[in-house]
Amino acid sequence: MKIEKKIWKIWSTHPTNDRKGYRLTELLAKGSLLVARKELNRAYEIFSQIILADPSWFEAWNKRATVLYMMGKYEYSQKDINQVLKLEKRHFGALSGQGLVQTELKNYEKAINSYKKVQKIYPSMQAPKVMISHLKELIKGQSI
């Protein structure tokens, strides 16, 4: 868990150590606070602003994907997740989010594949194991 926290801290800090990087890091933190407060429209605007300023910062895409998921805009969330994974293919948070999105879209096999990728990257994470088991039960229930 300590390593996971360090990874999230790294991902949530803009990779440049200049004024722009500090400003974008602060904006990401502000957007994350808005998400916690369920002020999703404002958070969406902030993450979009960060993406415009630096489209290569995958964590801004990931945060916006989370907001879109929370808004029930699953297809748009998936598009942002695709961008995250294009920029950082080992982003276990985005892969987990993809599993959630695909579950909502009832694409259970795709969701399972996403969670299997998470397991390869982060074997000690428990949520993917639980979700895979749950999804397999859903698939079984559909075939009856």
Descriptions of predicted regions:
Residues 36, 70, 104, 134-141:
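Register position in tetratricopeptide repeats
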Residues 5-8, 48, 82, 116:
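Alpha-solenoid helical repeat scaffolds
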